[in-house]
C-alpha cells in the first residue's frame, strides 16, 4: 500500500458485515485487504475464542492493538472485530485515521446472525438483552471515531456507493 493513502477501516458491532463488505470492496477496486481478527488468529496460530481463553480479553486487546498498528501501514482496507473500540490504544489509533466507516444494523437482525456463533466469544449463547446491552455500551465509541455511519442491511453495491460518495465528497 502507498503510505500516502489512508486505509479504509470498517468498524461496527459483530455481525454487521465488515468482513463481507471489506472483501467486496477490495475485490471490486483491486485494493489490498485484511480481516484483523483472521490475521490475529493466523499469526497466533489460535482461534479468537482460544486466544480469549488463554490470555483473556485484555490480553487479546493488547494483541489486537499490535496487529492494528502493523495493518494500518500495509493495507488499503481493514475490517476489524466488533470490540476493537474497547482497547484504549486501538481506539486512539482509529481516532487518528480519517476513513473509519461504521457499519450499523438493527440489533435484532444482528442477534439472529450471531447468537449461536461459537467464534464470537462475546456473543455466543448471549440473550438479546445481553447483546443489546453490549451494543449500547459501544455505540458512543463507534460514533466518536467514525467518518461516516452506513446501514449495513442494504446491498453490498449500495454500501460501496454510499462509502465512495462520502469519500469523494470529503
Curated annotation (Swiss-Prot):
One of its GO terms (molecular function) is magnesium ion binding. It catalyses: shikimate + ATP = 3-phosphoshikimate + ADP + H(+). ATP binds at residues 15-20, 120, 154. It is an enzyme of class 2 (transferase). Transmembrane segments: none annotated. Binds 1 Mg(2+) ion per subunit. The keyword ATP-binding applies. Pathway: Metabolic intermediate biosynthesis; chorismate biosynthesis; chorismate from D-erythrose 4-phosphate and phosphoenolpyruvate: step 5/7. GO terms for cellular component: cytosol. InterPro entries: P-loop_NTPase, Shikimate/glucono_kinase, Shikimate_kinase/TSH1, Shikimate_kinase_CS. Substrate binds at residues 37, 61, 82, 138. It is found in: Cytoplasm. Its cofactor is Mg(2+). The keyword Metal-binding applies. One of its GO terms (biological process) is amino acid biosynthetic process. Catalyzes the specific phosphorylation of the 3-hydroxyl group of shikimic acid using ATP as a cosubstrate. Monomer. HAMAP family: Shikimate_kinase. This is Shikimate kinase. The gene is aroK.
Amino acid at each position: 500500500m502507498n503510505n500516502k493513502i489512508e486505509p479504509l477501516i470498517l468498524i461496527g458491532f459483530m455481525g454487521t458485515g465488515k468482513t463481507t463488505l471489506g472483501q467486496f470492496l477490495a475485490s471490486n477496486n483491486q485494493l489490498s485487504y485484511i480481516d484483523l481478527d483472521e490475521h490475529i488468529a493466523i499469526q497466533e496460530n489460535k482461534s479468537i475464542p482460544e486466544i480469549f481463553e488463554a490470555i483473556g480479553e485484555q490480553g487479546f486487546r493488547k494483541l489486537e492493538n499490535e496487529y492494528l498498528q502493523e495493518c494500518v501501514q500495509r493495507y488499503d482496507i481493514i475490517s476489524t472485530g466488533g470490540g476493537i473500540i474497547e482497547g484504549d490504544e486501538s481506539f486512539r489509533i482509529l481516532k487518528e485515521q480519517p476513513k473509519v466507516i461504521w457499519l450499523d444494523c438493527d440489533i435484532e437482525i444482528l442477534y439472529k446472525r450471531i447468537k449461536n456463533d461459537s467464534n464470537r466469544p462475546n456473543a455466543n449463547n448471549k440473550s438479546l438483552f445481553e447483546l443489546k446491552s453490549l451494543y449500547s455500551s459501544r455505540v458512543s465509541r463507534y460514533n466518536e471515531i467514525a467518518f461516516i455511519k452506513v446501514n449495513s442491511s442494504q446491498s453490498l453495491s449500495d454500501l460501496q456507493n454510499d462509502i465512495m460518495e462520502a469519500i469523494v465528497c470529503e
